[in-house]
């Protein structure tokens, strides 16, 4: 399954995920840590260990270096 991952304020990527892939897998695929982001589906946060069931997500970075 291909999923569009939009990192808010940054870039949007297409990520291939296995049928049993989780939202944490998506986050790692765009070189982020699941501990520094929240994944949003239809504007609502989802658990990182939940299986991916949609084809588009937004990723909100909670920690940003500076």
UniProtKB/Swiss-Prot annotation:
Keywords: Isopeptide bond, Nucleotide-binding, Phosphoprotein, Ubl conjugation, Ubl conjugation pathway
Knockout or disruption consequences: Cells lacking this gene grow similarly to wild-type in the presence of either DMSO or oxygen as the terminal electron acceptor, but are retarded in aerobic growth at 50 degrees Celsius. The lysine tRNAs of the mutant strain appear to be nonthiolated.
Matches recorded under Pfam families: SAMP2
Modified residues (1-thioglycine): 66
UniProt xrefs under SUPFAM superfamilies: MoaD/ThiS
UniProt modification remark: The C-terminal glycine is likely acyl-adenylated (-COAMP) by UbaA, and also probably thiocarboxylated (-COSH) to function in sulfur transfer.
Domain of life: Archaea
GO molecular function, one term: protein tag activity
Cross-link position per record: Glycyl lysine isopeptide (Gly-Lys) (interchain with K-? in acceptor proteins): 66
GO BP annotations listed: protein modification by small protein conjugation
InterPro entries registered for this protein in UniProt: Mopterin_synth/thiamin_S_b (IPR016155), SAM_domain_containing (IPR053752), SAMP2 (IPR053833), SAMP2_halobacteria (IPR053834)
Glycyl adenylate: residues carrying this PTM: 66
Cross-link named Glycyl lysine isopeptide (Lys-Gly) (interchain with G-Cter in SAMP2), sites: 58
Function: Functions as a protein modifier covalently attached to lysine residues of substrate proteins, as well as a sulfur carrier in tRNA thiolation. The protein modification process is termed sampylation and involves the formation of an isopeptide bond between the SAMP2 C-terminal glycine carboxylate and the epsilon-amino group of lysine residues on target proteins. Is able to form polymeric chains with itself at Lys-58, similar to ubiquitin and other ubiquitin-like proteins. May serve as a proteolytic signal in the cell to target proteins for degradation by proteasomes.
Subunit comment: Monomer. Monomeric and polymeric forms interact with NcsA.
This protein's name: Small archaeal modifier protein 2
Gene name tied to this protein: samp2
């Amino acid at each position: 399954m291909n999923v569009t991952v939009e990192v808010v304020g940054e870039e949007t990527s297409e990520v291939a995920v296995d049928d049993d892939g989780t939202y944490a897998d998506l986050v790692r695929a765009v070189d982020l840590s699941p501990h520094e982001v929240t994944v949003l589906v239809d504007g609502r946060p989802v658990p990182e260990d939940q299986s991916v069931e949609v084809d588009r997500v937004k990723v909100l970075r909670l920690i940003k270096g500076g």
